[in-house]
Swiss-Prot record:
Biological or metabolic pathway of the protein: Lipid metabolism; prostaglandin biosynthesis
Catalysed reactions, as listed in the record: (5Z,8Z,11Z,14Z)-eicosatetraenoate + AH2 + 2 O2 = prostaglandin H2 + A + H2O; (5Z,8Z,11Z,14Z)-eicosatetraenoate + 2 O2 = prostaglandin G2; prostaglandin G2 + AH2 = prostaglandin H2 + A + H2O; (9Z,12Z)-octadecadienoate + AH2 + O2 = (9R)-hydroxy-(10E,12Z)-octadecadienoate + A + H2O
Tree of life domain: Eukaryota
Gene3D superfamilies named among the record's database cross-references: Haem peroxidase domain superfamily, animal type (1.10.640.10), Laminin (2.10.25.10)
Record entry for activity regulation: The cyclooxygenase activity is inhibited by nonsteroidal anti-inflammatory drugs (NSAIDs) including ibuprofen, flurbiprofen, ketoprofen, naproxen, flurbiprofen, anirolac, fenclofenac and diclofenac.
A Pfam short name: An_peroxidase
Protein name per Swiss-Prot or TrEMBL: Prostaglandin G/H synthase 1
Length: 606
């Protein structure tokens, strides 16, 4: 190999000499302890329109605007199609007004094919607001396999407020949030009972509690971010239990039926002596007086055990119908098919009567899974912690409970183990259907006996660092409120909230939902509808029985089972499982003459 020539060596030597003559670089010193640490830029929630904030280095960020329809540093520049769609989209306030007025127009729509078209639009637009597959949870504020696969977690729609933010709500508001007890007593505690202007009753209130406790089962051992309801939807775990062991204790293992006991000639859930499952009753209540059902807390309220009794009777009634239709089926097939039928009946009642009552719409809602078969839809659901918090509707509860001529206080009503049997199903259904429930929104309408529940919800939301109320409004396509006065629609409460929070952008999620001014003649405000409806509809229509693979007569034992679902109503649930047919509805009677004495009407195939 030839040596390098002297002419090439000279420039290298000169370069080394110059480097030696350069002054040394300044030493790397630790940061000044007195200098303020850089604020996590994601604490400002800079990314709009569902853009994802990614922190870069210490004080920089990037917004991932992929498939949002927007671009720019903060996902604020719409593309042409997004701009056009946003410009033409009517406001939620206008849509709500349209759906709750001009009755003659909606009577025409309900009688035509337009109804199905509108229902399909409502279902797809609402459901598309819920991320599927699920994204975040209590421990993962970024996309991860654990957040997707671990069903022990509640999912969450928005990631938590970063831990290193200047204030609990990001950068807005005060360094310390107001005391939860003070907040509840000043803004949520009832002064005078405010009835729901839509006429919602206690039959509705107890249905809401009974229905939602199948998928809202926060784990006391693991913490508020975890659930014991691993089905994450309408699986009727509150009827059959949330584990195979509990289910087996409740089953008769004959003709597909559930265990039961007969008291005064009527069928009720079995006692804990007959079905040894854990039920939460006060100490001193003997096992023979404890009724055993799928949800361990249903002994708390006679209204919950009332629905547990109705669904037990319905299960065993459907088993008899299937047994007559399929005499060769064994116990397991009868049980499993009946469970699917009851899931379908539940969803039908929820959409066409329960949600219908909540909405106040003149558009007649319809449960027909086939409406979605022509569009892209994911038949899977994960319950979100925001949905769990949103659904704490304790303002529904009255000051006392009226059954016949007797008025019961909370102390007399809670854990009353004899009321259901003493009065019977018909009398309680009639009483609960006639008593008004409270208005949910607008604030100051939670009875003091249940106010502690709202306090715990606020504390849990802080533990899980839920983003501010306005961030959730933006996430669900709503305009953020500019002031507390705009939120509440009045000045006194707005001034008090301003004093406690300091900034409307620091208002917490749950207080915002309950303190928002109600829509005209409505049970709650705009946000409860626009945020709650997507969770609800995605959970209902995302059920496997609504999929093309499941939604066929053979799944439900033929036309007999399929027709049970398609014709299910709240009235049928009650009147086909009682000796007489009481007044039953999700709203109080409109007039004294629209129903008659319960004992005069016998149950028939309605």
């Amino acid at each position: 190999m030839s040596r390098s020539s002297p002419s090439l060596r000279l420039p290298v030597l000169l370069l080394l000499l110059l480097l030696l003559l350069l002054p040394p670089p300044p030493p790397v010193l630790p940061a000044d302890p007195g200098a303020p640490a850089p604020v996590n830029p994601c604490c400002y929630f800079p990314c709009q329109h569902q853009g994802v904030c990614v922190r870069v280095a210490l004080d920089r960020y990037q917004c991932d605007c992929t498939r949002t329809g927007y671009s720019g540093p903060n996902c604020t520049v719409p593309d042409l199609w997004t701009w056009l769609r946003s410009s033409l989209r009517p406001s939620p306030t206008f849509v709500h007004y349209l759906l709750t007025h001009v009755r003659w127009f909606w009577e025409f729509v309900n009688a035509t094919f337009i109804r199905d078209t509108l229902m399909r639009l409502v279902l797809t637009v609402r459901s598309n607001l819920i991320p599927s597959p699920p994204t975040y949870n209590l421990d993962y504020d970024y996309i991860s396999w654990e957040a997707f696969s671990n069903v022990s977690y509640y999912t969450r729609v928005l990631p938590s407020v970063p831990k290193d933010c200047p204030t609990p709500m990001g950068t807005k508001g005060k360094k310390q949030l107001p005391d939860a007890q003070v907040l509840a007593h000043r803004f949520l505690l009832r002064r005078t009972f405010i009835p729901d202007p839509q006429g919602t009753n206690l039959m509705f209130a107890f249905f809401a509690q009974h229905f939602t406790h199948q998928f809202f089962k926060t784990s006391g051992k693991m913490g508020p971010g975890f659930t014991k309801a691993l089905g994450h939807g309408v699986d009727l775990g509150h009827i059959y239990g949330d584990s195979l062991e509990r289910q087996y204790h409740l089953r008769l293992f004959k003709d597909g039926k559930l265990k039961y006991q007969v008291l005064d000639g009527e069928v009720y859930p079995p006692s804990v002596e007959e079905a040894p499952v854990l039920m939460h009753y006060p100490r001193g209540v003997p096992p023979r007086s404890q009724m055993a059902v799928g949800q361990e807390v249903f002994g708390l309220l006679p209204g919950l055990m009332l629905y547990a009794t109705l669904w037990l009777r319905e299960h065993n009634r459907v088993c008899d119908l299937l047994k007559a239709e399929h005499p060769t089926w064994d116990d397991e097939q009868l049980f499993q098919t009946t469970r699917l039928i009851l899931i379908g009946e539940t969803i039908k009642i929820v959409i066409e009567e329960y949600v219908q009552q909540l909405s106040g719409y003149f558009l007649q809602l319809k449960f027909d899974p086939e409406m979605l078969f022509s569009v892209q839809f994911q038949y899977r659901n994960r319950i979100a912690m925001e949905f769990n918090h949103l659904y704490h509707w304790h303002p529904l509860m009255p000051d006392s409970f009226q059954v016949g001529s007797q008025e019961y206080s909370y102390e007399q009503f809670l854990f009353n183990t004899s009321m259901l049997v003493d009065y019977g199903v018909e009398a309680l259904v009639d009483a609960f259907s006639r008593q008004s429930a409270g208005r949910i929104g607008g604030g100051r309408n939670i009875d003091h006996h249940v106010l502690h529940v709202a306090v715990e919800v606020i504390k849990e939301s802080r533990e899980m660092r839920l983003q501010p109320f306005n961030e959730y409004r933006k996430r669900f396509g709503l305009k953020p409120y500019a002031s507390f006065q705009e939120l509440t629609g009045e000045t006194e409460m707005a001034a008090e909230l301003e004093e406690l929070y300091g900034d409307i952008d620091a208002l917490e999620f749950y207080p915002g939902l309950l303190l928002e001014k109600c829509q005209p003649n409505s049970i709650f405000g705009e946000s409860m509808i626009e945020i709650g409806a997507p969770f609800s509809l995605k959970g209902l229509l995302g059920n496997p029985i609504c999929s093309p693979e499941y939604w066929k007569p053979s799944t439900f034992g033929g036309e007999v089972g399929s027709n049970l679902i398609k014709t299910a109503t709240l009235k049928k649930l009650v009147c086909l499982n009682t000796k007489t047919c009481p007044y039953v509805s999700f709203r109080v009677p409109r007039s004294s003459g629209d129903d008659g004495p319960a004992a005069e009407r016998r149950s028939t195939e309605l």
